[in-house]
C-alpha cells in the first residue's frame, strides 16, 4: 500500500539522544574478556627505572636495562609489578617485544582506575 502524501514519521527516531563524543581513552584499558592492558612507551638504557610520564596515549617508562635479548622487556615487567604491587607472573608483555611501543597485560583483577592512580603517583615521586 502506498504512503499517503504528507504523512510523516511522527514519534519515530524522536527518542534517540544526540550522540556524545566518547571520552578519550587513556593508556589503561579493559579488553572485552575483562583483562586490563597498559600502553607503554619504553625507554631502555636509562640510568634507573622510573615512570616518567602518563599521557592519554601511553605510560612512558624508563628502563635501566639494555634493549638486547629481551632484558629490557623482563625488567619492564618486573618494575611494573613492583609499582602496581602485583606478582611478577601477573604482568605479561602482550605486544611490542622488539618495539618501544608496547602493550602490557595484567592478569590480576585490579580496577583500571587504581592502576592509573598508582602510575601517576610514581610520576609525582620523581
UniProtKB/Swiss-Prot annotation:
Cystine connections: none
Phosphoserine modifications at: 89
Any one Pfam family match given in the protein's UniProt record, by short name: DUF167
Disordered: region residues: 1-33
Keywords for this protein: Phosphoprotein
GO CC terms: cytoplasm
InterPro entries associated with the record: DUF167, YggU-like_sf
SUPFAM superfamilies in UniProt: YggU-like
Family to which the UniProt record says this protein belongs: Belongs to the UPF0235 family.
Identification of the protein by name: UPF0235 protein C15orf40 homolog
